[in-house]
Amino acid sequence: MAEIAVEVVYALPERQALLRLSVPAGTSAREAVRLSGIAEVFPELDIHCCPLGIFGKALANPEERPLEAGERVEIYRPLIADPKEVRKQRAARARAERGD
């Protein structure tokens, strides 16, 4: 079976990793993460259930999505803050600064 080149990336605020690897054609996004060995670089990462995406687009079923040559699998971290709540806080600060 032919091999394809893909990348697996993960980033924390203080540390990032980009791993390039060759995988058999038809390998799923989740399997590529496992094959990359990124769990050894970030032992706290649970690669079996973390959300994945490709080039900034989240995957609904990373276990079923076969990769294409050159794709970058991104491992997503949970959000630290609720985006809606952050917007509310920012708006409240802006109102307070304007004196509304």
Curated annotation (Swiss-Prot):
InterPro entries: Mopterin_synth/thiamin_S_b (IPR016155), RnfH (IPR005346), RnfH_sf (IPR037021)
Domain of life of the native organism: Bacteria
Pfam families: Ub-RnfH
HAMAP family according to UniProt: UPF0125_RnfH (MF_00460)
Family: Belongs to the UPF0125 (RnfH) family.
NCBIfam families to which the protein is assigned, alphabetical: PRK01777.1
Protein name listed in UniProt: Protein RnfH
Taxonomic classification: Bacteria, Pseudomonadati, Pseudomonadota, Gammaproteobacteria, Pseudomonadales
